[in-house]
């Protein structure tokens, strides 16, 4: 994120905004300099960072879903929900920014390692792993005396020198690659054996009855308990695989949502959007991106197609609730051990829902409908239900439209004031490290181990969390995105979006996100000065972050 003067404004508006920005700056300075503001006072807080994998913006009860998520919703009821929080369009770029506060094109994940284009390979920022030009929040907290624990999905480098223990975590139970089975078979997408580590060592087997959501949450609890009386605060990073496909569940969860989605995706999506409006997550007149042209109306499907589609969503919903139950297990533990009140808890999703279908083969076997959701099956839900998960937004994971990059963020506990608040502040995943370090009273250094490291590009959300300010960004601040050749710039309410064909127009389009969160009305012709201003910001973003547009892309008919 970079800032600049907003030349789109009239002279009078600039003078008015200058006064407003000055007042905000003075308030922020006063907040920053006041004794203990946003920082640890007598005791440094514990910090829990919880990440859902591929959960959509509209998949939580507190964001309008019919899926039962009582534990996440309880955090929302005592904390702050952010309605305009953005991430990258896929997992590893988001995670690199979430742990470093630095743009993914600097941190080494300018593209996912799996989709690195030939012209990107070997370029700085495109290593395909978390590089040494950045320092992780876990490293800084560890050096500041924190116990640091991780459990779950890593996806930021597969060599031992890239594993969590090399990036500041003292204990871990980790799936190193980007996905695979949730069960003990350790299968990857093509049935290959996936790499897991335990405290920095590769493991050969997982326990019988292993399930990712249950075992990762238990690992965090066990690590906290083992060192609970040593006097140190802890940073716990719980990186769920759920609800990422394949949808697999313990037997008692398989029929949790049986029959709940028989009315189909058109009805469920409309109901979610209405609930979002009632909750204040969406404005009453918010636009909605229409059902994708390649998705038939539910009423047009055959009975068999409806049966299968509804079952896919039943399993997905159960995955979300099962994850929530295991979050509840952790929160219950924190309360039972009198740790909850001094803990900052952050929950987010790493990107939009997965609407792209994977081609999987042997040994995965989906031939028996009654076995769906069990070991050996790889169930996905496709674009239609992904649109339900994304709510009113356009597209889903893999795209820098709002459906791919708008994610739920809930922050509760230490340093938050005003139970159940909804914040419309523009926030970004790069803000997470700055917020954590502010809470812990730990500065971000310019050097580490004698080497220069990239500065944090995020902003601490602490002034919003403690209700000192409504936003940490002014009208001249802007944010940039690029992934797979798709690109975007956002400044205040304006977003300039390039989506390649066949999913987009293959040129720049301008949207007013306040009036049009569904990105349905291109205002490029009506607002040429705004368009040119944001194009200039795009050029600055690309140059400052060493963006290399790919010559091949998994989402584009033709790249660049």
Q: Which positions does each model-derived feature cover?
A:
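C-terminal segment of classical bacterial N-terminal signal peptides
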Residues: 28-37
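Formylglycine-dependent sulfatase
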Residues: 21-25, 40-508, 515-543, 547-560
């Amino acid at each position: 994120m970079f800032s600049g003067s907003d030349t789109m404004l009239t002279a009078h508006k600039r003078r008015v905004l200058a006064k407003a920005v000055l007042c905000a700056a003075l308030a922020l300075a006063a907040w920053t300099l006041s004794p203990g503001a946003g920082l640890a006072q007598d005791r440094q807080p514990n910090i829990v960072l919880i990440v859902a994998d591929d959960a959509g913006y509209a998949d939580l009860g507190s964001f309008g879903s019919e899926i039962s998520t009582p534990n996440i919703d309880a955090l929302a009821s005592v904390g702050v929900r952010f309605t305009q929080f953005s991430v990258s369009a896929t997992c590893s770029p988001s995670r690199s920014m979430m742990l470093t506060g630095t743009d993914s094109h600097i941190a080494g994940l300018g593209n996912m390692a799996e989709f690195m284009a030939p012209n990107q390979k070997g370029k700085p920022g495109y290593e395909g792993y978390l590089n040494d030009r950045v320092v992780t929040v876990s490293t800084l907290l560890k050096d500041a005396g924190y116990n640091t624990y991780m459990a779950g999905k890593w996806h930021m480098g597969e060599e031992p020198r890239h594993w969590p223990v090399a990036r500041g975590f003292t204990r871990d139970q980790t799936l190193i690659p980007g996905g695979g089975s949730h069960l003990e078979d350790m299968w990857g997408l093509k049935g290959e054996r996936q790499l897991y580590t335990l405290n920095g060592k590769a493991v050969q087997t997982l326990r019988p009855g292993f399930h990712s959501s249950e075992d990762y949450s238990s690992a965090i609890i066990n690590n906290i308990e083992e060192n609970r009386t040593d006097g140190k605060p802890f940073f716990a990073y719980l990186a769920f695989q759920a609800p990422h496909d394949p949808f697999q569940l313990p037997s008692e969860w398989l029929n949790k949502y049986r029959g709940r989605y028989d009315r189909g995706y058109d009805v469920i999506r409309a109901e979610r959007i209405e609930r979002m409006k009632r909750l204040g997550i969406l404005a009453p007149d918010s636009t909605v991106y229409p059902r994708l042209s390649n998705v038939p109306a539910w009423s047009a499907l055959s009975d068999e197609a409806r049966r299968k589609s509804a079952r896919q969503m039943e399993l997905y919903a159960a995955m979300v609730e099962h994850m929530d139950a295991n979050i509840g297990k952790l929160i219950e533990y924190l309360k039972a051990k009198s740790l909850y009140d001094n803990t900052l808890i952050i929950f987010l999703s790493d990107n939009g829902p997965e609407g792209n279908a994977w081609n999987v083969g042997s040994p995965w076997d989906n031939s028996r409908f009654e076995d769906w959701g069990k070991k050996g099956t790889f169930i996905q839900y496709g674009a239609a239900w992904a649109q339900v998960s994304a709510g009113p937004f356009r597209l889903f994971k893999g795209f820098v439209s709002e459906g791919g990059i708008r994610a739920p963020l809930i922050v509760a506990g230490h340093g938050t004031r005003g139970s159940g608040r909804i914040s419309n502040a523009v926030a970004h995943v790069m803000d997470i490290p700055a917020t954590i370090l502010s809470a812990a009273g730990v500065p971000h250094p310019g050097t580490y181990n004698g080497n220069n490291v990239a500065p944090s590009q995020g902003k601490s959300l602490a002034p919003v969390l403690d209700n000192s300010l409504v936003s940490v960004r002014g009208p001249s601040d802007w944010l940039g995105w690029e992934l797979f050749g798709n690109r975007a710039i956002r400044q205040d309410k304006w977003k300039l979006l390039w989506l390649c064909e066949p999913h987009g127009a293959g040129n720049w389009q301008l949207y007013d996100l306040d009036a049009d969160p569904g990105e349905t009305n291109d205002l490029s012709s009506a607002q040429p000065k705004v368009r040119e201003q944001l194009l200039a910001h795009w050029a600055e973003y690309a140059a400052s972050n060493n963006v290399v547009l790919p010559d091949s892309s998994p989402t584009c008919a033709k790249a660049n």
